[in-house]
C-alpha cells in the first residue's frame, strides 16, 4: 500500500513506466462497522482527497473502490465505482448496526458424511491426547472427514455441535488435521438413532428446527 500523503508522488513515478497501468485505486476500512466514528470519517476523507488529487493531476484512477459489507450497507457515499461485499455474500451481518438497516439470510452450509462408526468401551479415549473418554456404554463415536486443515479451528475441540437428523450431537476429542469425531448418546428420555457409514451430518446450516450458524462457530 501507499500512504495517502505519498499517493501523488507514487502515481507520478509509475507513469514513466510504459509497462505499468493504473487499473484502480482503493483502500480498506479499519472501522467500517462504526460509520459515525471519527476514525472512519477521517479515512474516508483521506481516501477521497487522494483520489481527487490523482484526477486533478491529470492521471486516470481506473476503478475506485473501498466499501466492504458494512460500508456498502451503511454509507452510500463510499460506493464509488463498485463495492466489495465479503461476509455479506454469505448472508451474515458484519455488525449490529447493519442488522437494523437490512435483513440478511444465511446462504452457506457445510455438510459431511460419516466415514467410520465405532462403539468404544466405557473409559476408552477418543482422539489425540484422549481429551474425551467414553463415559458409559451405548455411546456411538462417528468420524467425519473435516479437520483443521480445512479451516475448522482446533480450539473448537470438545466445544462444538453438529446436526444429525435434526438433533444436536457433540463433537468429542481433539479435532484432527483432516477429521473429527462426534458422540451419539441416547437415553430413555431422548432417543437418537445411531448413525451409519455414509450418513450426512451438518457442521453449519439448518436441519429441521435445529440450526448452527457461522456466528455460533466463531
Describe every region a protein language model picked out:
Residues 1-121:
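Active-site loop/helix belt of alpha/beta enzymes
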